[in-house]
Amino acid sequence: MVTELANLKSISKSFGGIHALRSVNFDVRPGEVHALLGENGAGKSTLMRVLGGEIIPSQGEVVINGKRTELRDPRDARALGIVVIHQELALAPDLSVAENIFLGELPTLISRFSLRRRAKQLIDRLGFDIDPGRLVGTLSVAHQQVVEIAKALSQDIKIIVFDEPTAVLGAQDAMKLHQIIRGLRDRGVGIVYISHRLDEVFDIADRMTVMKDGETVGTVATTDVKIDDIIRMMVGRPIANMFPERSQRTIGAELLNVKKLNAGRMVRDVSFSVRAGEIVGLGGLIGSGRTEVARAIFGADPLDSGTISLKGKALKLKSPRDAVKAGIGLVPEDRKEHGVVIDKPIRVNATMARMSSVVNALGFLKPALERTDVTALGKSLRLKASSIDAPVSSLSGGNQQKVVLAKWFHAGGDVIILDEPTRGVDVGAKAEIYALINKLAEDGKAVLVISSEHQELFGLCDRVLAMGQGQIRGELTPSNYSEENLLGLSMMGGARASNQGSQV
């Protein structure tokens, strides 16, 4: 009897003399969730591209259902029931949800009614409410992820690989996804789960394999290890303090004040303040209005009413340029689209928010000063790059995020807003980014952090504001931090606020 759906034996892969994989062993069993863990650059995605038929290994064997197999392209893998859902989604933005789900069956299945009916059935199974006739390009990133999963479920799958599936999902949607994964596991599907969120990995996985520098560190049963053991395997050392000590910071006078803010449909009568040296979190479900609040404060979306004040002075923000001039910076949730110019050098990205500091009186660039400033920034942020002339696209996710942070360190404003600051970042880089965020507060900045990772909010923030349906429903402090309290406030609002936190 075959006990493994897939067995990757002694897999090696080189790209131009660089060893991406070195004799890696990995297997997938029916009815099991096998987590694949490691820092960015460890080789996880490369190994899954081998399983998905996207790349051919330099050495080693791919065994599917007990038979040695050559997977020459993704079609070979799909024919064997292997589907890989990548972090970078492969959808056609100008086609409808239904057309994307059944793209492989077009044009043979041309009835729009049939397409949409079948698509709705799949989406309903996933527990989401998405119009199958809507263009994919108009969906949120979270709902695009749902479409990608529905597309996989439309096929007769034996193995499904999830690469960072909850990176763009809030807690509620992540719970729905985990229910789906458990259902697939119960049907005998083999599941590979890649994630940097170790708490959810321990919740969903039966086994874990850790990779480092293109090699297998080890495979363990989830019940046999603790999170600290996995971190040590991943980074080669224990991370004693993932989050910095709050006691090292001095909280001063109020810097940012937002009063009765209304913007579009998603920001309704929002009021709060952030003081110098303070880190305030903004929590809630996806679609609660958190990102929209950030965009309104940054001048990216127009206000319908309300005031934004900095150091007691009301601001008139008609654009992000106005916000930057006033001293407000934003690290957006999608760093590749809005945080950096991905193909430009590190030095250009790091100085673009305050070019005036590296040009002369005539407006010409002073290259020596630019290099000096960016080199110093890179050292202070522990940026790992071959050169400050390297394009941002050549960096890992964690180092790309450091470049976005470098931009605002260089700009020197008073208020920094960070939207999902560690999305897609490995555990070692997370600890470094947390330290950098804390450094901003130590330097007297007012810091607003938006995150779908509750432990991130609780570990970093002095206070956490709970948002729901475009409103701030309440506030939590360290004495009553818990996921139950945050979700309770976000979903139920004032009815439970007296028991769980302060009303704002």
Curated annotation (Swiss-Prot):
Binding site for ATP: G38, E39, N40, G41, A42, G43, K44, S45
Residue ranges constituting the ABC transporter domain according to the UniProt record: 6-238, 251-494
Catalysis performed (reactions): D-ribose(out) + ATP + H2O = D-ribose(in) + ADP + phosphate + H(+)
Cell location: Cell inner membrane
UniProt enzyme class: translocase
Keyword terms of this UniProt record: ATP-binding, Cell inner membrane, Cell membrane, Membrane, Nucleotide-binding, Plasmid, Repeat, Sugar transport, Translocase, Transport
Membrane topology: Peripheral membrane protein
Classification via InterPro entries: AAA+_ATPase (IPR003593), ABC_carbohydrate_import_ATPase (IPR050107), ABC_transporter-like_ATP-bd (IPR003439), ABC_transporter-like_CS (IPR017871), P-loop_NTPase (IPR027417)
PROSITE patterns in alphabetical order: ABC_TRANSPORTER_1, ABC_TRANSPORTER_2, RBSA
GO cellular component, one term: plasma membrane
Predominant location category: membrane
Recorded superkingdom: Bacteria
Its EC number(s): 7.5.2.7
CDD domains: ABC_Carb_Monos_I, ABC_Carb_Monos_II
GO MF, one annotated term: ABC-type D-ribose transporter activity
Subunit structure, as described in the record: The complex is composed of an ATP-binding protein (RbsA), two transmembrane proteins (RbsC) and a solute-binding protein (RbsB).
Family according to the record: Belongs to the ABC transporter superfamily. Ribose importer (TC 3.A.1.2.1) family.
PANTHER family (alphabetical): CARBOHYDRATE TRANSPORT ATP-BINDING PROTEIN MG119-RELATED (PTHR43790), D-ALLOSE IMPORT ATP-BINDING PROTEIN ALSA-RELATED (PTHR43790:SF3)
Protein purpose: Part of the ABC transporter complex RbsABC involved in ribose import. Responsible for energy coupling to the transport system.
Name of the protein this chain belongs to: Ribose import ATP-binding protein RbsA 3
Species this protein is from: Rhizobium meliloti (strain 1021) (Ensifer meliloti)
Name of the encoding gene: rbsA3
